[in-house]
Every structure is written in structure tokens, then in C-alpha cells.
């Protein structure tokens, strides 16, 4: 089954809603954003969650030491590096975060524009992180745009990335289009924020459940094809 993360969790009700819907992980944004959550709030939410649920903190251009302190203080099981953290720093992040999941976000448009030299920096460091997440950031906004990137254009690139890393697809996913994303990319995971909200950081119960159901159905369909 495709791993499913509901990102931008800001309150316990939404966390329980996503957990009950069948999400595998929740995301907590600590970088400046309309969906930002304070560490104290996130820690209280995480303390109330089942242990099997992933708790992923989203950070931007924080040092390995700062990220490690955040993970320890809040109780995170993983970190999503959403900024410009270079490939040659991945070893330092891994050393600072033993036993925790590390996801490195790359912006799809940047990947397409920069080409293989840009990707090779992360390919050479792939042993130090657990997944590449492809997102559709915009100028001044590193995620949560609600706009998908060009799936057809980047599909061949995703196939190459999958040769050396687990891949998570994000960026403009909704209950209506996530099945198509699963069919096109056959990713290890998918990640959604604005596509299941009725306002920034406020989850819509029916949309969350519909999203998780759509992922499950699409994953089962892909399994039958294999």
C-alpha cells in the first residue's frame, strides 16, 4: 500500500481525524507558514497519537543540530527537509538524526530546470536519507501551493530517481487526482496538505477520508497489475 502522509497538522482534532481515516503519518510545519505549528502544540498533539503513526517535522534550512533538537523536544519520528539543504550535508543530517526518517524535498520545477547535475548531488548522498519528496513550490512558497507540477514532464525523471531513492509525490494532490498520480508514478508515498483542507491548517473530514480511500483503491489496483 502507498504510504500516505497528511501534512500541516495544527490541532489534535485534525490529527485524530487523519489517524482515524487511515493515514500512515502526519506532518507538522515548523517553518514560517500559514500552517505553522508551535513546538509546544505539536508535542502535545504527538503525545496523544498512537505510536505506529509517523510524526514528521517539516523544516527549512535549519542546521542538523537544530533539527535534531527539534525532533527530540517534540517527539518526531522523522524530518522533512523542505529547504535548499545541499546533498553534501545529508551525511550530517543522518548523523544528527539516528533512527529517524529523513525526507529531502526537491521542487519539481527546479529539478526539471537544473537537470542531472543537480540530482547527482543527492544521488551520491542517497544512503543518508530515506526518501525524495517532489513538491510544487512557488516563489516565496515552498509547499502548500495546491497546484500540481507537470506530471508528464517529470515522469521520466521520477523513474530515474527511483533507481536510487524511495519517492514521495506531493504538490497539488486532491481526492480527485491522487489516484492518477499513483498510477503515473507508482510512488512509495504521497503527501497532501491544502488538498484536504477547508482553510490553511484546518482539515476537512470528508476530504481526508476520500483522499485516503482513493490512495488505497489506486494502490490495490497497481498491485493487481503486477
Model regions and ranges:
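Extreme N-terminal starter segment of soluble prokaryotic enzymes
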Residues: 1-5
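Well-formed, non-transmembrane alpha-helical positions, independent of function
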Residues: 17-20, 44, 69-73, 92, ...
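Conserved, mostly hydrophobic/aromatic
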Residues: 18, 79, 132, 150, ...
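Conserved anion-binding
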Residues: 25, 30-34, 41, 48-168
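C-terminal helical cap(s) of enzyme catalytic domains, especially alpha/beta-barrels
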Residues: 40-49, 91-93, 193-226
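Proline-aspartate-enriched helix->loop->beta-strand connector
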Residues: 75-76, 187-190
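A C-terminal functional module that forms or caps the active site or interfaces directly
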Residues: 160, 168-183, 197
Amino acid at each position: 500500500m502507498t504510504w500516505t502522509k497528511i501534512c500541516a497538522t495544527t490541532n489534535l482534532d485534525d490529527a485524530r481525524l487523519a489517524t482515524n481515516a487511515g493515514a500512515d503519518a502526519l506532518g507538522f510545519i515548523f517553518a514560517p507558514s500559514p500552517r505553522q505549528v508551535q513546538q509546544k502544540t505539536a508535542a502535545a498533539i504527538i503525545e496523544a497519537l498512537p505510536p505506529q503513526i509517523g510524526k514528521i517535522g517539516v523544516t527549512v534550512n535549519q542546521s542538523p543540530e537544530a533539527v535534531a533538537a527539534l525532533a527530540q523536544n517534540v517527539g518526531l519520528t522523522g524530518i522533512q527537509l523542505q529547504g535548499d539543504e545541499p546533498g553534501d550535508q545529508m551525511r550530517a543530517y543522518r548523523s544528527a538524526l539516528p533512527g529517524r526518517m529523513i525526507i529531502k524535498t526537491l521542487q519539481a520545477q527546479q529539478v526539471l530546470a537544473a537537470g542531472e547535475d543537480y540530482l547527482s548531488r543527492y544521488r551520491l548522498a542517497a544512503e543518508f536519507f530515506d526518501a525524495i519528496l517532489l513538491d510544487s513550490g512557488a516563489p516565496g512558497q515552498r509547499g502548500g501551493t495546491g497546484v500540481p507540477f507537470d506530471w508528464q514532464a517529470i515522469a521520466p525523471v521520477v523513474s530515474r530517481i527511483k533507481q536510487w531513492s524511495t519517492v514521495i509525490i506531493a504538490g497539488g494532490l486532491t481526492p480527485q487526482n491522487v489516484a492518477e498520480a499513483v498510477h503515473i508514478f507508482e510512488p512509495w508515498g504521497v503527501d497532501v496538505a491544502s488538498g484536504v483542507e477547508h482553510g490553511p491548517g484546518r482539515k476537512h473530514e470528508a476530504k481526508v477520508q476520500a483522499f485516503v480511500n482513493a490512495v488505497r483503491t489506486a494502490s490495490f489496483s497497481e498491485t493487481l497489475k503486477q
